[in-house]
Amino acid sequence: MENLKTEIKAEPLVIETVEHLASTLDPTLYYHSPDHTKDVLRQTMELAEEDALDSRDVLLLAIAAAFHDAGFLEQRPKNEPIGAQMAVQAMSASGRFSQAEQDLVEQMILDTQLVMEGPAQISNSRLSPWLLDADLANLGRDDFWDQTRLLAKELEIEIASMLPMTRALMQRHDWQSPAGKRLFAAKKEANFVALEEELSKDN
């Protein structure tokens, strides 16, 4: 896996996209920042390793992770289709990826758009579960509160208004991959309990 990680870190599509985001993204994207993209990339690879995915799948996941928020370069609402098209264009131009692989990466990125009713996320490709879990991994990690504050700052709302929205999201959210369930479920439950306690203070 170490050789694969080195290979992916040297993948031009990943490097160029991450560097472009770092130099170009709106600095008021406090949550959807270049650091978030790097975090999702790292987390995606860790989840893929945990579930022993093959090297080609890990590469496709890494490309999807690098591009999953690239649409923010053009607009904030409904940015996912833009990022998906950026990924497809870059993969096509490289000449190293089949049409099926391009379609797979496109669908993974489209799947990162949160669903407004019912389940918060829906996987429509065989690799989407690992990207989706990486994208919302903070729900089941120690940095849950820090990331929640960053999102509130980005949305320009008070944390008191952010917390009920976060609770609603967590109630509709389920981990999609086996690794996501193993690594994040317990901490997400603990974070949810702490969130409920915080909300109860305001009542």
Where are these predicted regions, by residue range?
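Divalent metal-dependent phosphate-bond-processing catalytic cores, especially two-metal-ion Mg2+/Mn2+ enzymes
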Residues: 25-54, 67, 114-203
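Conserved N-terminal diphosphate/IPP-binding helix and adjacent helical/loop segment
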Residues: 1-29, 33-37, 41
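His-Asp-centered metal-binding catalytic motifs of divalent-metal-dependent phosphohydrolases/nucleases
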Residues: 40, 58-74, 83, 105-113
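Conserved aromatic-histidine-acidic binding/catalytic patches
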Residues: 28, 32, 71, 75, ...
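Inter-helical turn/loop segments and adjacent helix faces that build the functional surface
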Residues: 51, 90-100
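Short catalytic/metal-binding and nucleic-acid-binding patches
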Residues: 14-18, 50, 80
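An active-site-proximal "capping" alpha-helix that borders the catalytic cofactor pocket
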Residues: 40-44, 78-94
